[in-house]
């Protein structure tokens, strides 16, 4: 994915920072996967592991951002190289926030287990669907970056709409349960917080896809409609 330069050290610097970012992405994706497994099975120990690993992601964000700054100062890159470094600096911020959302899911899971909630008490199929979709989007967004594949980003944008629909479907389910049983209100609010975190993960995965388009085409596609974004990704 890196264009060759006269300086082999410059190539090595760019490849190194890209590899670090992808490693951070791998860890973040693992965090989300583990957080969803903990939530789906109401596993407090698994949730605790997610919370313990959060600091590793925070440290990586700081280290990678510093490395991007160092390369810009030393090499004064232009054109796509500069866009790449600027995008990585923003991508790691989104990845760190995905890690924060995974931690929120873990915290909600711990509260649910402490309250004695059981996985079978309510229909969580929409939540599981949204979680699986968010993990898939995150994986594909990282793959599209690695291969600078803008065409793959179009489906990621469409899938974000699917997550939003699943979120609203789950909220309707929660409201029904809480109306029927007021003792479910506290549990329902924790599930709502977890669902909102999943929705936000989908948003961050979409941001990652947008940065791939920016690197390749130099077009800032933030704040445009999903239809326009998908069209830009495919042209």
UniProtKB/Swiss-Prot annotation:
SUPFAM superfamilies: PhoU-like (SSF109755). InterPro entries: P_transport_PhoU (IPR028366), PhoU-like_sf (IPR038078), PhoU_dom (IPR026022). Keywords: Cytoplasm, Phosphate transport, Transport. Its main location: cytoplasm. It is found in: Cytoplasm. GO terms for biological process: intracellular phosphate ion homeostasis; negative regulation of phosphate metabolic process; negative regulation of phosphate transmembrane transport; phosphate ion transport. The keyword Transport applies. One of its GO terms (molecular function) is protein homodimerization activity. It comes from the Bacteria. One of its GO terms (cellular component) is cytoplasm. Belongs to the PhoU family. Plays a role in the regulation of phosphate uptake. Homodimer. This is Phosphate-specific transport system accessory protein PhoU homolog. It comes from Burkholderia sp. The gene is phoU.
